[in-house]
Amino acid sequence: MKFDAVHHIAIIGSDYDKTREFYVEKLGFEQVDEHIRPEKNDILFNVKKGNLVLEIFIKPDAPMRPVMPNPEHTGLRHLAFQVADVEACLEEFDRLDIRHEVLRTDDFDGKKMAFFFDPDGLPLEIHE
């Protein structure tokens, strides 16, 4: 079996305005579509940056996932974005009021990294 690439990553958010602002206005993704689905009580929109597509479901009644700092639950741990300069990203996060952890060094590859969080507390990572 051959997989060519990751097609998309699906995320569930609870608040349309906050989630859209975070991914589109703050992180710079382009919104490519939007579907209001009353029968499922949600809104689905896709955002894209380069080859990365995030499929975002807004479900106001979805239960919240366990909070950090304990990410050790079964399932997706976090989503990591490769960046050229983690420190510059952290400065931008401060300017944009994006909650993040401190700069640290990856134990395995020795590169700079840091975790940050979307409006619902989903752990995300930037990594050089």
Which residue stretches match the model-derived regions?
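A short, acidic/glycine-rich surface segment
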Residues: 32-34, 40-42, 62-67, 102
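Exposed loop/turn and edge beta-strand positions of beta-sandwich/beta-sheet ligand-binding modules
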Residues: 5, 41-43, 75, 110
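N-terminal beta-strand motif that seeds the catalytic metal site of vicinal oxygen chelate
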Residues: 1-18, 76-81
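Vicinal oxygen chelate
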Residues: 1-2, 46, 90-128
